Amino acid sequence: MDLQKIIHDALYDFILSYIPHADLSTLDDVILSYITGVLEDLGSQESVEENFDVEVFVEMLEAYIPGFSDIDSVKVCEMMFNLAAKLTSARDTESGEMKIEEGKFPLSESCDLSLGGSREKTHNLTLQAEGATAQVSESSWDNQEQHLLEMFPKCSVTEARSALSIAKGDMEEAVRLIIEGDVQLKCPPSLSANQGKTVSAEVDQKLKASILEKYMLVDDEEDKKVHRPVTPKDAPKKMVRYHGSQVVTTKGERYHLVKKEEPEDMKKTYVSLKPARKYRFH
């Protein structure tokens, strides 16, 4: 049974029941992966119902489907929790069918199938785990796992076993692998009120990167443009003011007027207004 198809059909039926004319073509892989992550958290054993942040979920879907925020939050919660329970039961049914099919095969064939199915992901870890179990007894192995879990609270049981398998039962080597990041720790969902806001750091970063890659507009021409200031065509005019019959600048500095020498032709045009001479006769 395809879990993605279950989520897809349930979400479509829920939206169309409240918004009949909704455009469901906007629901792409990005929003479906976000919903899948939220449902996985709700279906986990450590999840608590109060940790589901309905406001963030409604705000996210409102960006894709206008009018989703008008749906009652209680109905949205009921839909999400019912869908999470449905997915959990579907996973349990699928795992039960796989166990029944494995029981029909002989022991050697089932071992070959299990090793062949997981060879791509855990081939190296399986070989090293076989060497480790030959050196360390089961009781000491459990004690070492418990010590690792106490030293690294964020470390899960699977990750502790992987570190011990790679280190071949060497406690110091396993601690070094976890500290140096050779065995990546996945943070478990916290029981705080903000759990619904972030599914996990890794999923959140992948979601952001996919949204930016799909919807962000990058102006490539902006880097090619060269911005140059416009040069003025004419020099700014200097303001000259007059104060007390003297030419001064805007700062109050005085200038002495220098008379220009006029040509002789211009001087001939001037009229002399001198009074006539008085002639006295003896």
Swiss-Prot record:
Q: What is the first-listed, main subcellular location in coarse terms?
A: cytoplasm
Q: Which residues form the CUE domain?
A: 140-183
Q: Does the keyword Cytoplasm apply?
A: yes
Outline what the protein does.
May play a role in targeting proteins for ubiquitination and subsequent proteasomal degradation.
Q: Which GO terms describe its cellular component?
A: cytoplasm; nucleus
Tell me what this protein is called: CUE domain-containing protein 2
- Keywords of this protein's UniProt record, alphabetized? Cytoplasm, Nucleus, Ubl conjugation pathway
Where is the protein localized?
A: Cytoplasm; Nucleus
User: Which domain of life does the protein's organism represent?
Assistant: Eukaryota
InterPro entries tied to this protein: CUE_CUED2
- UniProt organism field: Danio rerio (Zebrafish)
Family under the similarity heading: Belongs to the CUEDC2 family.
